[in-house]
Amino acid sequence: MYSYEPDTQIFSRRAMILGVGQLGLFGLLAARLQYLQVTQADQYGILAENNRVNIGLIAPLRGRILDRYGQEIATNRPNFQVVMIPEQTKDPIETLRVLEKLVPISPSRRKRLLRDIPRSRGFVPFTVAENLEWEQFAAINLNLPHLPGVEPQVGKLRYYPQDDIFSHMVGYVGRPDGRDLRRDDPLLKVPGFRIGKSGVEKQFDDKLRGSAGSRRVEVNNVGRVIRELARNPGIQGADLTMSMDSALQNEAISLLGEQSGSVVMMDVNSGEVLTIASAPTFNPNQFTVGLSQKEWDGLLDDQRKPLINKAIAGQYAPGSTVKMLIAIAGLEEKVITPEEKIVCEGQYELGGDTFHCWEHEGHGPMNMHDAITNSCDVYFYELARRLGIDPIERVAKKFGLGRPSIPGAFGEKKGLIPGRDWKRANLDAAWQTGETLIAGIGQGYMLVTPIQLAVMTARLANGGKAVTPQLLMNPQNASNTNDDLVSVDANGAENNDIQVDPAHLKLMHKAMTSVVNDPDGTAFGSRFNLSGVASAGKTGTVQVRRISKDERESGIIPNEELDWHLRDHALFIGFAPVKNPKYSVAVVVEHGGSGSKVAAPIAQKLLKMALERDRQPLKIKTASGAKFNKTKKNTAGTA
């Protein structure tokens, strides 16, 4: 009989081996499972959480920019906007058409949306419109039941409550462009984020920007946001308190009107800049939301160049406004005395060339005081010839001309005070005596900016203290400041004495006082008398075209009959009060025609306004944000 026992034994052995193997495999799986779920639970929990949770940046609230009294120049306001999530709409294109009837959508944005929406992942939101009026925003909310996939949102937008008054110096913000986005800064890619593009907004962007916030959101496997888990709003940027006075700035812009030019007013002792205006202006709020191509082209095509900050980047021949410096150089070099008289017959001859005085009939005998009061060109031709260019160059630079007043900041131009070395290096030619004569009346190669003229005037007024412009209140005590705004002289020292004989400065004060208050003075028509307080100054009318001999003989064409770009520039510098000077002012009106008729009245009205405001108790805002009452009053008939 056949036995099955050997086969059974073989089967049992195989089953045992298989069972042991299975047991071992399950043991390994159990051990691995224990390792993953127990030993590595925390690590894989974090990985799972990271796959489920996204962290995104939130743009911080930008710091404010304030004037010296705490009035807002730049702040933030609610930005009412409309966002569309394409996948939640029945028809994104049709929804866009409906929205166009409720809110304004620019042609460029509409074109971009029509192009990008079909290409996008449906859950990615698109900003359809922003910077909406409350009524428009309310209309969207009322129609939401009929607008699936549309979401009204309230963010923050940079806002300039005084519109164009500070447009050039404060600047504006805008969306990061291609060059910005190449920088390794994830905040630049956050929707709605703005950066400083010009002026103070750009110079202090890192201080004003603040620190980014963040939000943690739960997402599904395709990246769609399910819910928000946590939010950190970030830290608002630091506030900046500028030295400017909104009321004076507004008045300066108003006085310039439709003209092209600039005004700078500063404290002659502290250097605090109260007004730094450039015209025409532009509205920085337009840049915040984006200009249309037509608006941008209009700014570029305007011959008055509204995008240029003329106060610091406009370069002009100073004309007669520098005649006091020529006089000081003559006294320092002892080539003339204040009493010596030079006869003006209306022209000056040198080597066969004729140099004309603005007074064609001549002024007659002129001493230094009278020559400044009447702005006699012939007197200064002769004085410049005696001096040579070297002392003129030295004294001009000592008073702040030919070098930046705010080194490294805002794109300021340094102007030009020419000399022998400059001409040899730049024109490969020797200096000529005739060029010295032209420099003696502030023309030729010589170029200055309005802020340099204000600095020059301040140094003339304050007794030779090398004061420099300060654009922040108490910058040495402020933690949110930039050293670029604490100006220094060429030797790196702040507000040093520039080594001028006080007696020489006293002579200049008397002559400049006569310019405004003497009936023979070129600015007599714009004088003011505020309870015994008077001002001093100097006019300048700068020729921008060559007048031919034939035209002189037949009669010089009046400015008003010339094309705008051929008319003379109008300049005026001044300070007040005459006793204990406090404010200096410089006014340049491009192609304004006459310093005495156009620029001087603007300066005088501003000086008077500043003196009147000094008599009022005002709240000054310090750099720390605290306020204190400061009553400014006149003493001994001065302010």
Give residue ranges: language-model regions:
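N-terminal export leaders
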Residues: 13-17
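Beta-lactam-recognizing serine transpeptidase/beta-lactamase-like catalytic domain environment
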Residues: 2-5, 219-229, 269-321, 325-586, ...
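Small/polar-residue-rich segments within soluble enzyme cores
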Residues: 94-101, 115-237, 517, 544-555, ...
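Aromatic-capped interface at the extracytoplasmic side
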Residues: 33-55
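Conserved, well-ordered alpha-helix/loop/beta-strand core segments that scaffold catalytic motifs
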Residues: 224-262
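Short, small/polar residue-rich loop motifs at catalytic or cofactor-binding pockets
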Residues: 57-61, 212, 257-261
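Secretory targeting signals
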Residues: 1-10, 23-24
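Short beta->alpha transition motifs characteristic of CBS
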Residues: 60, 76-81, 275-281
